[in-house]
């Protein structure tokens, strides 16, 4: 294995922390998505003994979509990290496997349909593989380090 690739595999975040971050990010994205969907729907009629029915419906949609996206993000990152550590390689196959498992398990379980599970898994796998295969060229180490400050003195600062 290439030393640069080994350095990339030895990040400060472990697989568990990456999985937690993926779940939290998915929950945030799903909550925002649920909020947007709730604004497009009609507000229900005022019901007896229900205070603020529009707010309750919005919060339910936010929670439902947030938890679904959190599960997809957590399963995707978890399986990707598991496959990456098992294979000791970092390529687009890891993301494709993670995408298929996440789509098939979470969305297939939610729809309770095997054809839907296979279609969702294949869609997420292809999407992940396309994104990963296109983005691998930007991670080449060119040896330059960029600092948020200058390391060279300016001539004006000396006088």
UniProtKB/Swiss-Prot annotation:
Disruption phenotype: Lethal when homozygous. One of its GO terms (biological process) is protein insertion into mitochondrial inner membrane. Keywords: Acetylation, Chloroplast, Ion transport, Membrane, Mitochondrion, Mitochondrion inner membrane, Mitochondrion outer membrane, Plastid, Plastid outer membrane, Porin, Transmembrane, Transmembrane beta strand, Transmembrane helix, Transport. It is found in: Plastid, Chloroplast outer membrane; Mitochondrion outer membrane; Mitochondrion inner membrane. One of its GO terms (molecular function) is porin activity. Pfam families: Tim17. The modification N-acetylmethionine is found at residue 1. It is a multi-pass membrane protein. Residues 1-65 are annotated as: Contains beta strands. The chain crosses the membrane at residues 24-40, 62-79, 92-109. Coiled coil: none annotated. GO terms for cellular component: chloroplast; chloroplast outer membrane; cytosol; mitochondrial outer membrane; mitochondrion; plastid outer membrane; pore complex; TIM22 mitochondrial import inner membrane insertion complex. Voltage-dependent high-conductance channel with a slight cation-selectivity; selective for amino acids but excludes triosephosphates or uncharged sugars. Non-essential amino acid-selective channel protein and translocation pore for NADPH:protochlorophyllide oxidoreductase A (PORA) and possibly PORB. Homodimer and oligomers in membrane. Part of both the NADH-ubiquinone oxidoreductase complex I and of the TIM17:23 complex. Interacts with TIM23-2. Belongs to the Tim17/Tim22/Tim23 family. Plastid outer envelope porin OEP16 (TC 1.B.30) subfamily. This is Outer envelope pore protein 16-3, chloroplastic/mitochondrial.
């Amino acid at each position: 294995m290439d030393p640069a690739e080994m350095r990339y595999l030895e990040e400060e975040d472990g697989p568990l922390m990456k999985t937690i971050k993926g779940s939290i990010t998915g929950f945030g994205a799903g909550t925002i998505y649920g909020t947007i969907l709730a604004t497009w729907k009609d507000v229900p009629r005022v019901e007896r003994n229900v205070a603020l029915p529009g707010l309750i419906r919005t919060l339910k949609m936010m929670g439902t979509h947030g938890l679904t996206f959190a599960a997809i993000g957590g399963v995707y990152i978890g399986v990707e990290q598991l496959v990456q550590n098992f294979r000791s390689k970092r390529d687009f196959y890891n993301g494709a496997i993670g995408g298929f498992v996440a789509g098939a398990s979470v969305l297939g379980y939610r729809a309770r349909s095997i054809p839907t599970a296979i279609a969702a898994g294949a869609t997420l796998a292809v999407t992940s593989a396309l994104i990963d295969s296109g983005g691998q060229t930007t991670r080449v180490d060119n040896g330059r380090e960029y600092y948020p400050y200058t390391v060279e003195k300016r001539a004006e600062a000396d006088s």
